[in-house]
């Protein structure tokens, strides 16, 4: 359209401005208008009431749930204490659902499948579950960062989620984790000594499988890695293997 045509254009544009009175109302408006303006599924799901509850609860513990991208950054909250939705999903998937391989292999897809989403974000779970899962992963990351071996450093992401699951299962003395058990875990009990002992088992299984399967990334994403770790946890419970 030329400048002259634009000047003679008599069409009008109707703009409707809605001022929401609350976050809940704002999110209902966004969801209702999603057919006109496409919003990613993960972003839409993060507007559900359970995510608002998680956000409010975690903030009481100085953890800032970033269910709206960059929201916590814009509030000036510390980066290390800002928890993206995807990160929380990976933490719960790895620990509660005992699927650390999926946390490693497909982090961007955990909120796309209804079955996975419903298992991760369940309104019947105690909110402390989410806090504990975050703290366990943060503790695992800090532990792995302290390990000086360069081979370990290059494979942190291949063993991080698995070590978190293993350390939690061993501390709670079960390979069948339940939400309320995890919620009651005192994260301070996951000491450096505990991580040392658990890591020796995880790393042994990881190393053996790397020899069998060929590449570390393949091991980190494999079902077999999880299967062998859970079997080892059961052996520890039965007294067949000592920590």
List PLM regions with ranges.
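Accessory terminal alpha-helical modules
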Residues: 2-243
């Amino acid at each position: 359209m030329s400048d002259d045509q634009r000047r003679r254009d008599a069409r009008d544009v109707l703009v409707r401005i809605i001022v929401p009175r609350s976050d809940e109302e704002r999110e209902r408006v966004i969801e209702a208008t999603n057919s006109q303006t496409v919003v990613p599924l993960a972003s839409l799901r993060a507007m559900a009431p359970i995510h608002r509850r998680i956000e409010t609860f975690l903030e009481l513990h100085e953890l800032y749930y970033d269910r709206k991208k960059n929201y916590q950054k814009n509030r000036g909250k510390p980066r290390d204490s800002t928890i993206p939705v995807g990160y929380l999903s990976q933490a719960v998937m790895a620990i509660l659902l005992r699927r650390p391989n999926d946390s490693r292999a497909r982090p961007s897809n955990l909120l796309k499948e209804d079955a996975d989403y419903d298992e991760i974000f369940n309104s019947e779970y105690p909110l402390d579950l989410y806090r504990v899962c975050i703290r366990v992963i943060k503790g695992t990351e800090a532990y792995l960062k302290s390990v000086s071996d360069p081979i370990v450093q290059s494979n942190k992401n291949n063993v991080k989620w698995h070590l978190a699951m293993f350390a939690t299962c061993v501390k709670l003395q079960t390979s069948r984790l339940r939400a309320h058990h995890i919620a009651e875990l005192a994260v301070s009990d996951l000491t450096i000594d505990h991580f040392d002992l658990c890591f020796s088992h995880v790393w042994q299984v990881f190393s053996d499988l790397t020899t069998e399967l060929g590449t570390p990334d393949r091991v980190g994403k494999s079902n077999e890695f999880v299967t062998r770790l859970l079997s080892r946890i059961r052996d520890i419970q039965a007294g067949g293997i000592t920590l």
